[in-house]
């Protein structure tokens, strides 16, 4: 038996078209040298971000010290036993015009946390500008609590939703994959707060490059 993923989104093609149109419009904002072309004075500035959550990042501690490479082993050796310290959720967006990665690390990823991220974006960009997000259809993205917040900032945000089973259309997925390979895989910490700080440090280093 082989498995496949049934397309259960009747609007899959239209939603995919909408996402790809955002990317096409974005590509036209860069010249042949890859330099961003500023908006004209009579245009509304639109900031385009790819957004997603990465929940369940485990804070894991070792129960004994790692053994450094020596005569008997050529790699770092680690005890099989470990201690779980809890999990955190990463809410993040990538500004597709500047390349800046914007993180928020929380204990959960509910409507309150999502709204906190939106407020972070609202504080970051000039008030006259529009913020366009490419994101999935997670319930918190359109919850009653989220809608109430959005009603307080009319016209500020625009959402372009990926189709169900279309996460591959969201560019931040590639960033999360890189984050896992480079930093989260095999990470050990002494406290959950240390994990949070190391995630933020990773983003700082990415944004410095």
Regions found by a protein language model. Give the residues of each.
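Charge-mixed, compositionally biased segments that are often intrinsically disordered regulatory tracts
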Residues: 1-84
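Acidic beta-strand-to-loop metal/phosphate-binding motif
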Residues: 50, 128-137
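Residues immediately flanking
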Residues: 51-53, 96, 137, 164
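Electropositive, glycine- and tryptophan-enriched low-complexity nucleic-acid-binding patches
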Residues: 70-129
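RNase H-like polynucleotidyl transferase catalytic core
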Residues: 77-82, 151-171, 187-189
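Acidic, metal-coordinating catalytic cores used for nucleic-acid/nucleotide bond scission
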Residues: 109-110, 133-145, 164-169
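RNase H-like two-metal-ion nuclease catalytic core shared by retroviral integrases
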Residues: 136-137, 160-181, 193
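C-terminal anion-handling pockets and recognition modules
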Residues: 173-209
């Amino acid at each position: 038996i082989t498995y496949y993923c049934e397309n259960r989104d009747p609007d899959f093609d239209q939603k995919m078209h909408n996402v790809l149109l955002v990317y096409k419009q974005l590509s036209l904002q860069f010249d042949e040298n890859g330099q961003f072309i500023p908006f004209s004075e009579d245009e509304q500035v639109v900031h385009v971000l790819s957004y997603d959550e990465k929940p369940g990042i485990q804070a894991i501690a070792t129960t004994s010290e790692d053994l450094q490479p020596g005569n008997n082993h050529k790699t770092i050796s680690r005890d099989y036993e470990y201690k779980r310290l809890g999990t955190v959720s990463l809410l993040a967006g990538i500004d597709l015009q500047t390349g800046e990665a914007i993180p928020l690390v929380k204990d959960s990823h509910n409507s309150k946390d999502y709204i906190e991220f939106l407020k972070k974006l609202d504080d970051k960009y000039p008030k006259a500008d529009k913020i366009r997000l490419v994101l999935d259809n997670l319930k918190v993205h359109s919850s009653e609590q989220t809608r109430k917040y959005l009603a307080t900032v009319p016209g500020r945000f625009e959402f372009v939703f990926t189709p169900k089973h279309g996460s591959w259309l969201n560019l931040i997925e590639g960033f999360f994959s890189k984050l896992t390979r480079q930093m989260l895989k095999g990470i050990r910490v002494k406290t959950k707060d240390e994990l949070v700080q190391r995630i933020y440090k990773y983003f700082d280093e990415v944004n410095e490059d």
